[in-house]
């Protein structure tokens, strides 16, 4: 999203931009963290969506500490009926996945939780000796090295098996890059899987979206979550 320009600022709210003023209240936002604040112009009282000194909180830790920086959380179910949750700080703001849009007397903050990441399932689980050699022959030395670390040959069958334990972090990225560099496609992956009696199904990305609208109305701050802004995969129903 485009950076939000400050209409005004206040020394009591460093890092925050004033975006709406209705004569009684002023609305501020930090466009990096999406936290908002409301200043009552008559009393000087400030209300914040998140604690001001949360970084120095000594009680909260882990995900609870992150929740001090979040504005919302989504609970959802997986295919086993187990409930998990994502929050707007850990799963959206921390990855720069927010968009801001000015509305009448306020602002709309749109969050995307999660991202479409490629992983181990985007690499063939098994490759015949011929197919392995065909692919490796097209790769540069870095790609060939990645393959040697990511696949091991079954001496009896000659088949190369993916070493799942090795495919994490940088090694996973290097191996994905090696396949990308030779133009390896999802169709190639489906074909290579089929050759060994394996079915390939692209994993469903666990991506959610939600918007929060903040606006001033007389003496009040109105906070709205438009139902139409809530999006989630069918496989992960939201509670």
Each predicted region: which residue ranges?
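Intrinsically disordered, low-complexity segments enriched in small residues
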Residues: 2-3, 177-190, 198-201
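Acidic (Asp/Glu-rich), glycine- and aromatic
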Residues: 203, 224-239
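Long, leucine/valine-rich, helix-dominated scaffolding and oligomerization segments
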Residues: 102-109, 201, 208, 223-226
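Acidic-aromatic substrate-binding/catalytic surfaces of carbohydrate-active enzymes
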Residues: 15-185
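Short, Gly/Pro- and small/polar-rich lid/capping loops
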Residues: 2-12
């Amino acid at each position: 999203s485009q950076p939000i320009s400050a209409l005004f600022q206040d020394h009591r709210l460093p890092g925050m931009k004033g975006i709406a003023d209705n004569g009684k209240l002023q609305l501020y936002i930090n466009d990096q963290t999406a936290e908002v604040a409301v200043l009552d112009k008559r009393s000087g009282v400030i209300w914040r969506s998140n604690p001001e000194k949360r970084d120095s909180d000594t009680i909260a830790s882990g995900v609870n500490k992150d929740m001090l920086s979040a504005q919302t959380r989504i609970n959802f179910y997986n295919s086993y009926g187990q409930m998990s949750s994502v929050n707007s700080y850990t799963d959206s703001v921390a990855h720069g996945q927010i968009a801001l849009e000015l509305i009448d007397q306020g602002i709309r903050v749109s969050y995307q939780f999660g991202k479409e990441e490629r992983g181990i399932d985007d690499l063939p689980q098994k490759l015949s000796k011929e197919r392995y050699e065909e692919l490796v022959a097209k790769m540069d030395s870095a790609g060939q090295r990645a393959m040697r670390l990511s696949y091991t040959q079954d001496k009896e069958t000659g088949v190369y098996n993916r070493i799942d334990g090795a495919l994490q972090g940088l090694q996973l990225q290097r191996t994905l890059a090696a396949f990308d560099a030779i133009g390896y496609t999802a169709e190639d992956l489906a074909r290579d899987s089929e050759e060994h009696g394996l079915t390939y199904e692209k994993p469903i990305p666990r991506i959610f979206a939600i918007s929060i609208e903040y606006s001033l109305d007389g003496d009040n701050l109105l906070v709205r979550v438009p139902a139409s802004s809530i999006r989630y995969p069918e496989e992960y129903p939201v509670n």
